Amino acid sequence: MSRADEGRLIHLAKKREREKEDIEKQLRKLEEDKEKCKVGITSKFTANYETMEESVKSKTYGLVSLDDMKNIQKNEISNRDLQVARGASSSTSLAKDSQEAREKEEHVAKHTQKRVLSFAYEDEEEDEDAAPIVPKKRVGMDPTVDTSFLPDKEREEFLRKKKEELAAEWRVKQNTEKNEEITVAYAYWDGSSHRKNMKVKKGNTISQCLARAIEALKKEFTELKACTPENLMFVKEDLIIPHFYTFQDFIVTKAMGKTGPLFVFDSASDVRIRQDAALDYGESHPAKIVLRSWYEKNKHIYPASRWEPFVPSKKYGRNFDDLSDL
């Protein structure tokens, strides 16, 4: 705290003490006025009563009849009422003065309380007398400091809008790609291969592909006439693919099977992304469509013995037993 602030506080404290003394003097004066009013009223009524008694006694000297006594008392009472009526105006003015004094006392007390609780008004009054406050110098900022880690609303809003634009662009691109047609090579497997081709969209599911395969094969294979997609299995690269996957899921992620990519439809596809003895071979293996009942009967026999359910998080590759079959 500076010396100017200390002097200012001392000045304000002295001023409050003076105001407090003035208020106490006013309160004492009001109390004295109240006491005087009470004494004046009491003495006035007592004096009037004693004066009336003395007047009656002086006028009833000696023996007086009852009627005369009553008339004298009646006259004295009427005289007293007249005096009281004359003094009513003075008592009314006195009560009015007392009420005004009470209101003034309340106003002074209220004003004093406000002055005690608030320093703002007093500070404004003392602005001219107080010494000027010297503002502190602000340290300059270094423009070479990296502030990218600090929060920036404008930058965050820009990044948020950019992410939304990229996400919308990606969704539009995915929807466009899902509507593209591809040719899928498949073979109905009942112990021997019956290869065919069909055109589907990248966004079609494996279940939709199986339904179309049933329509194409049921004329040739009678066991498929009453068949549904749930009765069939879709096997690709020795992996049993669940029916809810789409072709787009495997194309985008470039999922690999045991013997190569699950689905590659590029003109120059990198069919093998592994360095092993089976790199060079012809076209990709066609998908196998198999009855579940046939698989349950023959799953211990090659090639069904090598099939296993597809797990997205698992990395597939050829092991020693697979290479020995080549």
Curated annotation (Swiss-Prot):
Protein name: Protein FAM50 homolog
GO cellular component: nucleus
Annotated stretches, region: Disordered: 76-112
One Gene Ontology biological process: chromatin organization
Family classification: Belongs to the FAM50 family.
Biased composition (Basic and acidic residues): 97-109
UniProt xrefs under InterPro entries: FAM50A/XAP5_C (IPR048337), XAP5 (IPR007005)
